[in-house]
């Protein structure tokens, strides 16, 4: 069934969207945090996490190539496991996007404060956050093509300062700073890998927009492989430069800005801070694009109120869903109640990853949509089993407080789901009763 959405995103625009969301704000802070946890073994943690995400991305590439509709992992879970599991996947993804959006808005304001201190507090802060949400909402309302083109521009704009940082920084690296000390504990190394999932994640959100891709069965595998390969190289080189240039990386609050000061002087932090603003804005645009399509996809399946599935007659975008997400994102951004959700961002993503990896052998066995699939993972069944096991390893290594927060989110989601289903069934029953009554009026 056609969803009524315009298929305006090509494979290279999808590559840009994926790079934009993967090379996001996480790399602006995490090089120092990971270095503090495992020292120079942070490079090994980067490589291990990249391999893990690479295997998971292969599963996404095959599963994603079987579908052309909107929903991404939500759609995959519905086909493989049923409506309830699909709702939970979609619900967790949506909450994660809202919380992630609000978090990045705060980071945006903080970096803007480097140039304009008044932006960090008071009415000025409120006005900036509101204006930022309004601009992004307008971009997404006008059309997905405009949103994708905006992502193209900001992908190039934010990669330029990062590439300059890498090229210039490589000439100032001190090999002595890569000396390995005593190996970290297994728990510390696992914690570092767990945190780095945040750096490499986000690609699953973009796949929600498959219903607006041209030839999604071919575009998804191509874009995932190209974008994540590019992101891995960029992120690993950034960590290498930070370690090799900055003596006290572990205690740096702005590692890229501090490192750039070493080899670029005062201009370095200014360039990096400006690049950070560009990076964050681009990532916010991608999150807004993906976040608004999740309620749309779930509403088309009668798991959320049906108005969220309406498509604007002129712009062919889900305007009710966009406005709803914008209002929720603005509220959370201004009130700060999103903080608890930040703690569960990684664990909810890992749960989503596990569901898609587990769906691969099920869809293969059912031969679901094999006529449209254009990509098949070599040794796909063993790879999917390994990925599910890795996800389980990451989940059990998380803190108990994160597990508690995820449980709260799951319970809240199930309540919303149950209420929506009850209301939907009531309307369906009323419609059947009305039809029956109308029919009896014609019987003597």
Protein language model features and the residues they cover:
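TM-loop-TM module centered on a large, flexible mid-protein loop between adjacent transmembrane helices
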Residues: 75-76, 82, 113-119, 193, ...
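Transmembrane alpha-helical segments of multi-pass small-molecule transport proteins
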Residues: 46-50, 115-145, 159-166, 320-328, ...
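Helix-loop-helix junctions that connect adjacent transmembrane segments
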Residues: 3-5, 40-43, 119-127, 153-274, ...
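Helix-loop-helix connectors at the membrane interface of multi-pass transporters/channels
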Residues: 1, 78, 105-128, 161, ...
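Membrane-interface "cap" regions at the ends of multi-pass membrane proteins
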Residues: 1-32, 36-41, 45, 54, ...
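A generic transmembrane alpha-helix motif of multi-pass inner-membrane proteins
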Residues: 344, 348-349, 377-434, 439-444
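Hydrophobic alpha-helical segments of multi-pass membrane transport proteins
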Residues: 162-165, 295, 345-373, 409-429
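Hydrophobic transmembrane alpha-helices that form the core helical bundles
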Residues: 32-37, 45, 54-133, 137-141, ...
């Amino acid at each position: 069934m056609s969803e009524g959405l315009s298929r305006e995103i090509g494979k290279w625009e999808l590559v840009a969207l994926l790079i934009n969301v993967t090379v996001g704000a996480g790399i602006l802070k995490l090089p120092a945090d990971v270095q503090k946890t495992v020292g120079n073994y942070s490079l090994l943690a980067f490589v291990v996490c990249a391999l893990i995400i690479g295997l998971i991305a292969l599963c996404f590439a095959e599963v994603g190539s079987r579908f052309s509709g909107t929903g991404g992992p939500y759609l995959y879970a519905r086909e493989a496991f049923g409506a309830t599991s699909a709702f939970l996947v979609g619900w967790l993804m949506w909450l994660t996007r809202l919380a992630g959006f609000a978090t990045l808005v705060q980071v945006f304001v903080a970096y803007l404060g480097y140039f304009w201190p008044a932006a960090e507090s008071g009415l000025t802060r409120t006005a900036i956050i509101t204006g930022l949400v309004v601009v992004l909402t307008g971009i997404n309302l006008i059309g997905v093509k405009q949103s994708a083109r905006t992502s193209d521009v900001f992908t190039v704009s934010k990669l330029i300062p990062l590439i300059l940082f890498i090229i210039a920084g490589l000439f100032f690296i001190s090999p002595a700073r890569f000396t390995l000390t005593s190996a970290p504990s297994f728990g510390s190394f696992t914690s570092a890998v767990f945190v780095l999932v945040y750096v490499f994640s986000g690609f699953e959100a973009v796949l929600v927009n498959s219903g607006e891709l041209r030839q999604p069965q071919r575009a998804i595998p191509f874009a995932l492989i190209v974008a994540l390969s590019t992101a891995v190289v960029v992120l690993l080189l950034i960590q290498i430069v930070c370690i090799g240039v900055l003596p006290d990386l572990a205690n740096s609050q702005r590692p890229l800005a501090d490192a750039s000061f070493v080899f670029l002087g005062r201009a370095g932090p200014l360039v990096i801070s400006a690049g950070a603003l560009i990076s964050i804005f681009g990532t916010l645009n991608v999150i807004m694009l993906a976040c608004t399509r999740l309620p749309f996809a779930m509403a088309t399946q009668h798991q959320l109120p049906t108005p969220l599935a309406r498509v604007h007659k002129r712009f062919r975008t889900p305007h009710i869903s966009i406005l709803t997400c914008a209002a929720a994102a603005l509220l959370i951004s201004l009130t700060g109640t999103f903080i608890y959700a930040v703690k569960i961002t990684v664990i909810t993503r890992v749960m989503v990853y596990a569901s898609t990896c587990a769906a691969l052998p099920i869809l293969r066995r059912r031969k679901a949509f094999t006529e449209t699939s254009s990509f098949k993972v070599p040794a796909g069944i063993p790879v999917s089993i390994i990925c599910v096991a890795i996800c389980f390893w990451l989940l059990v290594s998380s803190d108990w407080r994160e597990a508690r927060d995820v449980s709260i989110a799951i319970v809240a989601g199930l309540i919303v789901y149950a209420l929506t289903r009850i209301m939907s069934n009531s309307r369906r029953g009323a419609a059947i009763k009305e039809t029956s009554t109308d029919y009896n009026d014609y019987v003597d």
